[in-house]
């Protein structure tokens, strides 16, 4: 079954509500480049209230800093393309099994996708540019070769069934379920959960 990650959570009330639903991962962005940014201390606070796996998301981070970041979260997502030296360094750490690497959904990044898969267990194929929908054709092609990828990028209630039919490892959803950046629409999240976990056309 496809797993579900709700990302960009910035309020404790949302996180507590989602922890009661059939959501597999809760993403929290601790990088100031995002309008959904929260301080790292928020992660420690959240862990007191929920047992669901927490994903700490950053764009700007040094590989040497990740081990410390993982002290307050279950997984760490690096949402940028790494250079070869960073990938090699990441391979040397035991905690790389708790790392999620971002790969832009473009055929130009096919080689990088292969290197990312060789480095970590969890890889997210997402939009090339912020605010742009993920390229369905690229995702479909990548998943034929690597069926254990996660997929994100403007996935909404209107198009989610198309992505479920591709049977990715997980779907990463954020902006399409927001009232405003960082604040989610609980009813919309419930609809997403219903489709992914119980009501998708591909599972009927």
Swiss-Prot record:
InterPro entries: Aldolase_TIM (IPR013785), PRAI_dom (IPR001240), RibuloseP-bd_barrel (IPR011060), TrpF_fam (IPR044643). GO terms for molecular function: phosphoribosylanthranilate isomerase activity. The keyword Amino-acid biosynthesis applies. Its EC number is 5.3.1.24. The keyword Isomerase applies. GO terms for biological process: L-tryptophan biosynthetic process. Keywords: Amino-acid biosynthesis, Aromatic amino acid biosynthesis, Isomerase, Tryptophan biosynthesis. It catalyses: N-(5-phospho-beta-D-ribosyl)anthranilate = 1-(2-carboxyphenylamino)-1-deoxy-D-ribulose 5-phosphate. Coiled coil: none annotated. Pfam families: PRAI (PF00697). It comes from the Archaea. Pathway: Amino-acid biosynthesis; L-tryptophan biosynthesis; L-tryptophan from chorismate: step 3/5. HAMAP family: PRAI. PANTHER family: N-(5'-PHOSPHORIBOSYL)ANTHRANILATE ISOMERASE (PTHR42894:SF1). Belongs to the TrpF family. This is N-(5'-phosphoribosyl)anthranilate isomerase. It comes from Saccharolobus solfataricus (strain ATCC 35092 / DSM 1617 / JCM 11322 / P2) (Sulfolobus solfataricus). The gene is trpF.
């Amino acid at each position: 079954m496809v797993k579900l990650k709700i990302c960009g959570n910035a309020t404790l009330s949302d996180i507590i509500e989602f922890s009661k639903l059939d959501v597999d991962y809760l993403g929290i962005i601790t990088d100031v480049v995002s309008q959904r940014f929260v301080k790292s201390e928020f992660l420690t606070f959240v862990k007191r209230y929920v047992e669901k796996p927490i994903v700490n998301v950053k764009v700007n981070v040094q590989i040497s800093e990740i081990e410390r970041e993982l002290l307050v979260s279950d997984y760490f997502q690096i949402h940028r393309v790494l250079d070869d030296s960073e990938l090699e360094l990441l391979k040397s750490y035991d905690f790389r099994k708790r790392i999620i690497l971002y790969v832009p959904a473009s055929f130009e990044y096919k080689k990088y996708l292969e290197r990312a898969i060789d480095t970590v267990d969890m890889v997210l194929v997402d939009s090339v540019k912020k605010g742009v929908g993920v390229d369905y054709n690229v995702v479909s092609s990548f998943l034929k070769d690597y069926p254990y990828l996660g997929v994100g990028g403007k996935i909404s209630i209107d198009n989610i069934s198309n992505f479920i039919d591709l049977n990715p490892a997980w779907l990463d959803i954020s902006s399409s379920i927001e009232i405003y950046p960082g604040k989610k629409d609980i009813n919309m999240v419930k609809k997403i959960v219903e489709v992914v976990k119980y009501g998708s056309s591909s599972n009927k």
